[in-house]
């Protein structure tokens, strides 16, 4: 852990009894009080996450929109100022470089939020693709700290510290230069939990002050610090993908069921478009499905999936769901077996254990309308 990178909030983890792990080269808290109580706090009240390990890249210049359009699968041409879209960057073969959020500040100024473990790879990828465009591509990850305040009471808690009317900020929109407890912030109504909430971007020197103040004013509303363990169970219940699990360089967004963020009809020949069109026209041979264990056993990532003795795929994520109180999972399997209600077997400790395919909508998301 000594060689791991540390966020500006590393100094407060011990105070809040954070248990540390190495996550993508970062020393991060996997839990504070415990994964299940933290998970339940976010579903019922609110939770505060340190997500300063995430990456931020600025795209600026005359060709900013054209470059972003070439880089991503979604369509940025229809974005309003201060709007956000979810998207993928793909390789030419349709596999995923990363999933990301695209923030539009101005017509010539975009801000991309990328996964912590992919920062160097993504930045090099963007630089390599940018040579034909009149743009600046700046990795500003070290200049930004990010906190996520998530849960049904997130707005109530954050409103105590700002004069900005947060009820006016719509889902997947941002506001710049918001003052929170005297600190200048960028806030967006986004998150990775399936709940309403905010992601707050601040100067690293202000991160500790803001973290401590939020926990102080949120205490009466049940706000708790949340580690990466509950962050993963929350995103999993909401069927949100994690890079390296539901998506990677060998799994396309279409196979993973995220076609809504892939605009094959947009005029720009974006990276991976040809391969994705061909895959759609030929028909998917693999699909991401949800499943529930029928017999005892918790499914885990990379466990093999069988149908009548034939291996048909693998588990991408599996957990005991704290909300549903059931053992459930996501798996990438042969499309011909992907019908809801089908019985499959998950290989758990060398034993095939029965499961049934169910909708991936494990949990109804509670986003602000």
Swiss-Prot record:
Its EC number is 2.1.2.10. It catalyses: N(6)-[(R)-S(8)-aminomethyldihydrolipoyl]-L-lysyl-[protein] + (6S)-5,6,7,8-tetrahydrofolate = N(6)-[(R)-dihydrolipoyl]-L-lysyl-[protein] + (6R)-5,10-methylene-5,6,7,8-tetrahydrofolate + NH4(+). InterPro entries: GCS_T (IPR006223), GCS_T_bac (IPR022903), GCST_C (IPR013977), GCV_T_N (IPR006222), GcvT/YgfZ/DmdA (IPR028896), GcvT/YgfZ_C (IPR029043), TrmE/GcvT_dom1 (IPR027266). SUPFAM superfamilies: Aminomethyltransferase beta-barrel domain (SSF101790), Folate-binding domain (SSF103025). The keyword Electron transport does not apply. Keywords: Aminotransferase, Transferase. The glycine cleavage system is composed of four proteins: P, T, L and H. HAMAP family: GcvT. This is Aminomethyltransferase.
